[in-house]
């Protein structure tokens, strides 16, 4: 069998069609497949003529509506995106310095901002009621939180051992040794630091407590006159004048999972009868060449299987500016003015058609709403860690989400996905300028969602949470270490966002959102400092010999004070603040029915196990978050890798590498406290033993075998597992199907496999007009690639080749036409295995 015969056998043709092809050489095969009989001056350009035929034989159902067009040079191109109609979207520079703004105002250089509210007086009056109610509620929250904090801090002050200055005689400190004076003052300095940290941390816990409490009352009553979901009946027909784009920005994700969830979502939309009102955009920032080819193949399969031609689009950016927010902005500039709304989906998002239609109805019923955020439910994972987190978010999450809505109303959060956005104001007001200056907190904004919500509200548009709208789902990281990788990115992003706290025009609620975003991570080093100071105070108390007689001829000693009854009361009240939200959550489930959670006893046991699990993990997260905060301030680089989204267990080696320092700290801490005062070790036990056990908990909780065992026992059961909605059932079904036909080593297959090469050539985006300089560059890229082994061809050079239709055609021709010359490539490809289910093509044979 010669090389031409081998090439013909690799084509997805019927036996009769293969027999009709010439066996003389590769070029003749491409000429025979070219229905237009084009001629090329270069022999290795001949594969460009057969692109259409190779595609039609491999994916006949994907090209039913004439997606193949001609580019400016007459080459076949697969039209994966509609024609762009550009809009202007540009950011205003940030003015983060209020002193500078005041100085400009004095000099008459104050510029009228673009974000001045566009609402009419009538529209402002219609919204004034809920805005007034929201303001009053937030003042009440502030008063409750501060009052609770003041009382608790006073209690804390009274139980500390060194009261007043009775143990120090200031006159004796004059002229005495500095070290002696320092040791006398040290307990008071430590106590002052402890009190300050306690006040900050207690205030943070108190705010969460009141949020959960109001959420509980809201859900228990079941009626919310200010819920945005109450503005529609739920069955109104969608306005045909408003189109909605479902956009999914992805970057090096699990291709099988992305397209499984997207297919399930689209089929659910079609089942509602509203598919004509939606289009889908897959916006890829992937830079792994193998994944890029797999995405192209998966897109072709998707549009064939759901008849999505002309409604499901795919684009891969060659210039990845500003990460996810830049990807969304790029969509808005090119195609945004064709749509009234867009729904942003994450790579693991799944949404039902009813939920998506409901979001559109809410937008149409509330013309002053700029963003409406759904409340996604976590599901779909099988590791013990993920199932425990799914249970926690499913049980506790509704309370906190409803509580957030109660306090914020239309000035709420946006979490970056599973939300609908009004496109026009987003284009006009939500472009993100880089933060000025230098260092780790300057440059492109990392956590864009909170900032975009703040900018939307600054322009007068409402930002709502539809907390009671069902049908929105997401997945959680499968293990602790993968969650912490995500937390590191979020930590850096939230610290950057705090630079916008004093930006002109921001609503006080969103200034508070920036503050709470920082406290989500800054509370960890504050808690660690609180524990460290408490330990230091205990060390001083244990090792320093107290002086009971400070005056000459003093008759009665001055004792350090200890108030155990107040200590117990403060400890009990703190535990109430921490754990009452969990109790309220389970009480709500008891009231409304426990069947979907495994029954009364199982859901109660699951809650107790989750509490134990959270106690074990809290100190571990504390230390990691402390490191994240410190590293952000020191300017250590943050790597933006996509999070792990499958059920992947943590190896023992990685666990001890990541948690080894925590284990050592826990051992030293425990031994030291046991030597000083065994009673104090009792209070520190939940902290130090959690650190000692951290590598073991991390590994065991990451295993899906343990998680599936709890699933069989109906522990950590959630309604989405008890009675899965159809959209999640379909996602699992399509995920299994996609994994059976997964394409690995996509770049090498795009070079050698005739069908995948035709796809890569047709979808290549670097379609420049012919020029001598360009030809020289193309020849250099191809020659350099083929003169090296494939293993030495780095990622960036592969992407350059993959982006150019001419280089892909020439690579394909040369490796097939001269296999002996490029033996390193041929041998490497022959060592790979093409999944037989990866390409189906035409199955009919000649009669």
Swiss-Prot record:
This is Glucans biosynthesis glucosyltransferase H. Its EC number is 2.4.1.-. One of its GO terms (molecular function) is hexosyltransferase activity. The gene is mdoH. Belongs to the glycosyltransferase 2 family. OpgH subfamily. The chain crosses the membrane at residues 139-156, 194-216, 512-534, 568-590, 603-625, 680-702. It is a multi-pass membrane protein. It comes from the Bacteria.
């Amino acid at each position: 069998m010669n090389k031409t015969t081998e090439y013909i056998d690799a084509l997805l043709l019927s036996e009769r069609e293969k027999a009709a092809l010439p066996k003389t050489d590769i070029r003749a095969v491409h000429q025979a497949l070219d229905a237009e009989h084009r001629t090329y001056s270069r022999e290795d350009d001949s594969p460009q003529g057969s692109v259409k035929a190779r595609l039609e034989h491999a994916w006949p159902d994907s090209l039913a509506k004439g997606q193949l067009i001609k580019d400016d040079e007459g080459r076949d191109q697969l039209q994966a995106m509609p024609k762009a109609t550009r809009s202007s979207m540009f950011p205003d520079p940030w003015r983060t310095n209020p002193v500078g703004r005041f100085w400009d105002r004095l000099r008459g250089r104050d510029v009228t901002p673009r974000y001045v509210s566009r609402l009419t007086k009538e529209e402002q009056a219609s919204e004034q009621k809920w805005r007034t109610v929201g303001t009053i509620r937030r003042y009440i929250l502030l008063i409750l939180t501060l009052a609770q904090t003041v009382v608790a801090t006073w209690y804390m002050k009274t139980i500390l051992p060194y009261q007043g200055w009775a143990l120090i005689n200031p006159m004796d400190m004059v002229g005495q040794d500095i070290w002696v004076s320092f040791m006398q003052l040290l307990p008071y300095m430590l106590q002052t630091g402890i009190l300050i940290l306690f006040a900050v941390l207690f205030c943070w816990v108190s705010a969460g407590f009141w949020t959960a409490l109001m959420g509980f009352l809201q859900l228990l009553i079941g009626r919310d006159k200010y819920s945005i979901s109450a503005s529609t009946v739920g069955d109104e027909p969608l306005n045909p004048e408003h189109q909605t784009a479902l956009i999914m920005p992805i970057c090096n994700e699990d291709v099988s999972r992305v397209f499984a969830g997207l297919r399930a979502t689209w089929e659910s939309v079609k089942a509602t009868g509203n598919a004509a009102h939606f289009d889908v955009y897959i916006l890829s920032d992937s830079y792994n060449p193998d994944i890029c080819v797999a995405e192209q193949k998966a897109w072709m399969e998707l549009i064939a299987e759901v008849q999505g031609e002309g409604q499901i689009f795919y684009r891969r950016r060659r210039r990845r500016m500003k990460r996810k927010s830049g990807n969304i902005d790029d969509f808005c500039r090119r195609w945004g003015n064709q749509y009234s709304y867009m729904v942003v989906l994450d790579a693991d998002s799944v949404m039902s058609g009813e939920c998506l239609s409901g979001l559109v109805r809410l937008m149409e019923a509330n013309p002053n709403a700029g963003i409406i955020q759904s409340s996604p439910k976590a599901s779909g994972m099988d590791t013990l860690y993920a199932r425990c987190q799914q249970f926690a978010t499913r049980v506790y999450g509704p309370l906190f989400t409803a509580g957030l809505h109660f306090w914020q109303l239309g000035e709420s959060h946006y979490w970056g996905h599973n939300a609908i956005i009004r496109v026009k104001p987003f284009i006009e007001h939500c472009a993100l300028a880089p933060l000025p200056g230098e260092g780790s907190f300057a440059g492109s904004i990392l956590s864009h969602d909170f900032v975009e919500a703040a900018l939307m509200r600054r322009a007068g548009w409402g930002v709502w949470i539809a907390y009671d709208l069902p049908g929105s789902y997401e997945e959680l990281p499968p293990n602790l270490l993968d969650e912490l990788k995500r937390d590191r990115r979020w930590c850096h992003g939230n610290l950057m966002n705090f630079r916008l706290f004093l930006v002109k025009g921001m609503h006080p609620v969103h200034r508070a959102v920036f503050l709470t975003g920082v406290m989500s991570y800054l509370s960890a080093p504050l808690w660690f400092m609180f524990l460290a100071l408490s330990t230091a105070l205990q060390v001083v108390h244990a090792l320093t010999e107290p002086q009971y007689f400070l005056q000459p001829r003093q008759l009665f000693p001055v004792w350090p004070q200890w108030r155990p009854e107040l200590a117990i009361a403060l400890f009990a009240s703190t535990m109430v603040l921490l754990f009452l939200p969990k109790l309220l959550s389970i009480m709500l489930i008891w009231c409304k029915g426990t069947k979907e959670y495994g029954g009364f006893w199982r859901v109660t046991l699951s809650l107790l196990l989750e509490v134990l699990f959270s106690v074990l993990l809290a100190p571990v997260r504390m230390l990691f978050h402390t490191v994240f905060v410190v590293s952000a301030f020191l300017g250590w680089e943050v790597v933006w890798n996509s999070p792990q989204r499958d059920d992947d267990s943590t190896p023992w080696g990685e666990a001890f590498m990541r948690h080894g320092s925590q284990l050592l700290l826990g051992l030293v801490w425990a031994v030291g406290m046991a030597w000083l005062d065994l009673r104090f070790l009792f209070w520190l036990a939940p902290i130090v033993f959690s650190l000692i056990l951290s590598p073991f908990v991390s590994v065991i909780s990451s295993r899906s075998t343990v998680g599936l065992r709890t699933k069989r026992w109906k522990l950590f059961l959630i309604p989405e597992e008890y009675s899965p909605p159809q959209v999640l059932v379909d996602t699992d079904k399509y995920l299994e199907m996609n994994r059976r036909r997964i394409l690995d080593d996509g770049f090498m297959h795009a070079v050698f496999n005739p069908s995948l090469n035709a796809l890569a050539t047709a979808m290549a985006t670097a379609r420049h007009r012919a020029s001598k300089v360009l030809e020289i560059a193309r020849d250099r890229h191809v020659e350099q690639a083929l003169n090296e082994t494939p293993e030495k061809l780095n990622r960036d050079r592969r992407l350059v080749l993959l982006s150019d239709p001419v280089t892909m055609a020439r690579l394909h021709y040369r490796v097939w036409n001269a296999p002996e010359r490029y033996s390193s490539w041929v041998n490497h490809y022959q060592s790979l295995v093409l999944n037989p289910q990866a390409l189906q093509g035409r199955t009919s044979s000649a009669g």
